Amino acid sequence: MSGNHTPSASGPFSALTPSIWPQEILAKYSQKEESSEQPELCYDEFGFRVDKEGSEPGCSQMTGSPLVEDPPQRLRWQAHLEFTHNHDVGDLTWDKIAVSLPRSEKLRSLVLAGIPHGMRPQLWMRLSGALQKKKNSELSYREIIKNSSNDETIAAKQIEKDLLRTMPSNACFANVNSIGVPRLRRVLRALAWLYPEIGYCQGTGMVAACLLLFLEEEDAFWMMCAIIEDLLPASYFSTTLLGVQTDQRVLRHLIVQYLPRLDKLLQEHDIELSLITLHWFLTAFASVVHIRLLLRIWDLFFYEGSLVLFQTTLGMLRLKEEELIQSENSASIFNTLSDIPAQMDDAELLLGEAMRLAGSLTDVAVETQRRKHLAYLIADQGQTLGTGTTTNLSQVVRRRTQRRKSGITSLLFGEDDLEALKAKNIKQTELVADLREAILRVARHFQCTDPKNCSVELTPDYSMESHQRDHENYVACLRSHRRRAKALLDFERHDDDELGFRKNDIITIISQKDEHCWVGELNGLRGWFPAKFVEVLDERSKEYSIAGDDSVTEGVTDLVRGTLCPALKALFEHGLKKPSLLGGACHPWLFIEEAAGREVERDFDSVYSRLVLCKTYRLDEDGKVLTPEELLYRAVQSVNVTHDAAHAQMDVKLRSLICVGLNEQVLHLWLEVLCSSLPTVEKWYQPWSFLRSPGWVQIKCELRVLCCFAFSLSQDWELPARREEEKQPLKEGVQDMLVKHHLFSWDIDG
C-alpha cells in the first residue's frame, strides 16, 4: 500500500530519516522488484540520482560498499554514553541522555572516528547545542512557522525561486511535489523570520536541505539555529558575508603557515583562492563533497565548530599540493583547485591528513587572526565591513520574542530583550562598518584636497597604550606662538604699508595692538589690514587645512554632516531605551546633555570659575585649559544657546556638536566621557547596547583617526542667517580705518 513502503537494507533511500522517504518512488521500486524489471531511475541510499556517468560531486562519485554501520563502533558509543551518565543505557533510550554531552578527549576521539549513522540525528543535536536551544526557546517551532507563514518579504520570494535549485539531483527535492520541498520552504522561511538581519542566503538552503535528509524538520531547524548562532561567526549568511570573507583571509594566513610551498605558488600565479573556497565555507562543504564525506566532516563540525572548516580545507590542499605544484599554468592550477572536493573519496585519509597537518590549530589562534584580518578588510576596502567587539566578531540576534515585563520600568522604557542580553547583536558590527566607511571617506577627502595629509596613518591604533597617550597628548598639545588668520574677502593694496590679499588667503599676524587694524605678513610682504576682514584661525594643536574649512571647501560639509554624523547618530541610537507609554522624547542629544552635566557637576564651582575665566580672558583660544569634560559641557551649552534661538531640532544640535568636537580634536575623548558616565548610560541604554558594551572602546579608536586632520567647521552652519548680519556689510567702517591709518604712524615691523 502507498505510504507504507520501506527501503531495503542498504538500498535506495535507506540512509534517510523515515519521514522523508519518497513513498511514490519506493512504490515503483517495489513493483519493479516483483516484476523483476529495472527501474527507470536509480537512486543511492541518500536519495541522489545515480547514472552511468556519476552525476554530481554530491551524489555518487565516492565508491565503495553501501553505507553500513560498524557494530563495534556503535558499541563504543553506547559504552561511552553509559559510562558518562553512570547508568544502563540499554537500547539507547534517548530521553535518559542529557541534552548536551560533557566534552572530553574520549568523546573527541569517538567523533573523529565517526558517529554511527543511526545515532547521528540524536548526537548531532546534542553535540551542536541544538537540543538545548530547542528546550529553552520561548517560542516553539510551530509558533515560529505560524509567524513566518504570512511573511511575504523579498526573502520569502527568493526562497520560493531557489527551492527547486537547491538539490535537484535528490529525489526528495527534485520537483514541486517532492516530499522535502515544503519542509525546506518552512525551515528557510522560519530562519528568515527569526533572523531578520540575515534574511535568506543560498548557503543556508543547501545546509538545511542536507540536514532534512537525516533529521526531522523541527530538529533540522534548531540545528540551523545552532550553526548560525554558535558554530559559525556572525554574518556568514548576511548580505555583507562579513564572516565568511574574513575567514577567507584567515585561511590564506594559515596556508602561509602550514603550506608555504602552496602559498608561494598561489602568489606567483596571482590566484585568488577565495573565489573557490568561499563557497566551501559558506555551505560547510554541503554542496561540494560527496554526502558520505560530508557526514564525517559534519560529525566533527557539530562538535568543534568552524575550526573544522579550516582543518578540512588545509587537509584537502595538502593532499593535492604536489599535483598543484606540478601544474603548468594558472588555468590548470585554478581548475585543479576547483576539482579538489569532488576528488576526495577517502574520509579516513582526508581527516587523518587534516589532523596531522592542522590538528594543533586552536580556536584562540583562529579568533585572533579573525580580529586582525577583519581590521585589514576594513582598511583595504573601506566598505560596509566592521571590526567585531568580541573574539568571535559578534553573535546573531533573534527577532524579539520575549513577553513584556510588568512594572514601572517596562511602562517607561519598554521591556528588556533577554535574548539580546545573551547574544551580542550583529548590528554592532554593521554600525562600526558604517562609521569606519564614513571616517575613511573624510580622510580620503583630506588627502585628495590637501596633499600634506597623505602621510596620515588611517589604520586605528587599538593598543592599550594608545588610550594612555590620549590624555597626555591633549594636555601637552603644541601651542603654536605663530597666530594666523584667514581672509574673509579681497583687500586691495593701495599703499606700500598696506597688506593686500585675496579671499581665503592665510595671513601670519604680526601685531594686534590695535583692535581695528592689524599688521600681518603674506608671501614675504608686511603691511597693515582691517582686522574685521580676517578670521583668526584656531591652530593650537593643528595646522590649518583648506580641506577641513567648510567656508572654502563645501564638500567637507556633506561628508561630515551628511555621512559621518548619521553614522555616529546610529551608534548612539543603538539600544537607546524608548518610552513606550508616555510618548516622551527619546534622542541621543538628551542623553549627551545629561551625561555632560553629570560629569562636571561634581566640581561645578571650579568648572564654572574656569569657564568664566576663559570667556573673560579668551584662555581657550590662547591655550587649552579646559578638560575634555568641561569642553564638552561648554560645547553643549553653546549649541543649545545658539540653536534654541533658531528653534533647531535635536538632530541639528547633534551634528553641530560633532562639528565642534572635530574642530577641537576631542571627539574620541568626548565618547570616552559619555560612556564613562555609567549611571547615565545605564539609565538611557539597554544592557545589550553599544554604549554599555566594551565595543565603545573600539569606536573611540576609530574616531581618534580624525584627530590627525584640521577641521574649521561652522557650529551654526545649518542655522538660518541672522538678519542683523545681513544688514551689516563686512566693508562697513573700513573708511574710518583708512583715515585712522593716515593720521597715525604705524610700526610695520611690530
UniProtKB/Swiss-Prot annotation:
The modification Phosphoserine is found at residue 406. Residues 114-305 form the Rab-GAP TBC domain. GO terms for molecular function: GTPase activator activity; GTPase regulator activity; small GTPase binding. Residues 480-539 form the SH3 domain. May play a cooperative role in NF2-mediated growth suppression of cells. It comes from Mus musculus (Mouse). One of its GO terms (cellular component) is gap junction. It is found in: Cytoplasm. Residues 555-718 form the RUN domain. Its main location: cytoplasm. This is Small G protein signaling modulator 3. Interacts with GJA1. Interaction with GJA1 induces its degradation. Interacts via its RUN domain with the C-terminal region of NF2. Interacts with RAB3A, RAB4A, RAB5A, RAB8A, RAB11A, RAP1A, RAP1B, RAP2A, RAP2B and PDCD6I. No interaction with RAB27A. Residues 415-439 form a coiled coil. Widely expressed.
